């Protein structure tokens, strides 16, 4: 199924929604109960709420109020349910993180009345919030889903093994926590550690040589003026790490990396074997501050550049 990811800007979306909600709420209860799967009925936002922030928060908290998650017919109408989920994930970005996480957990808990519905909604969460190829990927939004799955009474214990493992990995190196230390080795054989590096910012770049996305990211970082400036001013260190075994391939591609970067590899494969960092998506970028606290996790080169421009 193809879903529509070209969603209106949230300001227009929220300002126009009162009219749509009002029309939906004017339907008779009989119409809604008889036809719950032909349309998705949004909650009516109180007219007293005029600020976009207020309207977004109300909508996030009450988005699914008109959905009966015990009705398994929703599973068979992805053009309604999946599109509603995509729109919901977009709105989550316009409320505080804590509000978004509480709303997601409440939503998933509500689906915990039926195993099929629970599996369907959590699969949607996996598709849009966890899949490395999803433009809406957001680990902080996905964590409440994993927590709900681990605590669910409709899932067998064997089914909970994967979400529990994912939850454990997702809770490592979260924004606001200290990044996990590790040792790296240079082509010369010299070694160092993450915690030994001293600068206002540290950009950890975990990558594989020759991968298309890695090459694009390297070019994006090289062409970002703010990154070049901060490296020159010794306020930023870029630590590029190869986590795998094919060292010959890594050495062949070393000339693609700027000499100003620290280019190393994980000699004992500790990052991968002990799952110190989530490697489901390669490349992956972490921006750390002087204390090695994570500022950005699994970010794009553009997001790194924008953050540094604002906070330099």
Language-model features: where?
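C-terminal motif of bacterial Sec signal peptides marking the signal peptidase cleavage site
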Residues: 15-18
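Oxidative protein folding and maturation machinery
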Residues: 21-190
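Short, glycine-anchored, charge-dense loop/turn motifs used at functional sites
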Residues: 189, 211, 288-294
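Short active-site neighborhood of thiol/selenol oxidoreductases, capturing the structured segment around
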Residues: 193-221, 237-239
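Structural microenvironment flanking redox-active thiols in thiol-disulfide oxidoreductases
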Residues: 218-255, 269-274
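Short, internal strand/loop/helix patches
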Residues: 254-286, 290
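Non-catalytic, surface beta->alpha helical segment in thiol-disulfide oxidoreductase systems
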Residues: 281-284, 290-312
């Amino acid at each position: 199924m193809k879903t529509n990811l070209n969603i209106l800007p949230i300001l227009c979306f929220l300002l126009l929604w009162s009219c749509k909600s009002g029309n939906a709420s004017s339907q008779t209860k009989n119409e809604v109960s008889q036809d719950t799967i032909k349309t998705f009925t949004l909650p009516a936002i109180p007219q007293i709420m005029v600020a976009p922030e207020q309207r977004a928060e109300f909508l996030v908290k009450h988005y699914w109020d008109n959905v009966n998650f015990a009705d398994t017919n929703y599973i068979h109408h992805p053009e309604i349910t999946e599109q509603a989920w995509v729109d919901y994930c977009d709105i989550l970005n316009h409320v505080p993180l804590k509000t978004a996480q509480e709303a997601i957990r409440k939503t998933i808990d509500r689906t915990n009345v039926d195993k099929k519905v629970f599996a369907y909604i959590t699969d949607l969460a996996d598709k849009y919030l966890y899949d490395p190829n999803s433009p809406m990927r957001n680990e902080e939004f996905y964590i409440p889903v994993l927590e709900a799955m681990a605590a669910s009474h409709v899932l067998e214990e064997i089914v909970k093994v994967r979400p529990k493992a994912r939850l454990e990995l997702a809770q490592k190196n979260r924004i606001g926590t200290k990044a996990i230390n590790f040792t790296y080795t240079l082509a010369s054989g010299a070694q160092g550690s993450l915690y030994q590096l001293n600068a206002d910012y540290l950009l950890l770049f975990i990558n594989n040589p020759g991968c298309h996305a890695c090459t694009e990211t390297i070019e994006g970082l090289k062409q970002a003026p703010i990154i070049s400036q901060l490296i020159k001013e010794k306020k930023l260190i870029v630590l590029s790490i190869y986590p795998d075994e094919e060292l010959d391939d890594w050495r062949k591609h070393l000339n693609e990396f700027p000499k100003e970067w620290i280019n190393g590899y994980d000699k004992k494969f500790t990052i991968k074997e002990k799952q110190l960092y989530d490697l489901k998506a390669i490349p992956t970028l972490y921006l750390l501050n002087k204390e090695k606290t994570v500022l950005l996790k699994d970010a794009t080169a553009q997001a790194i550049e924008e953050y540094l421009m604002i906070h330099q």
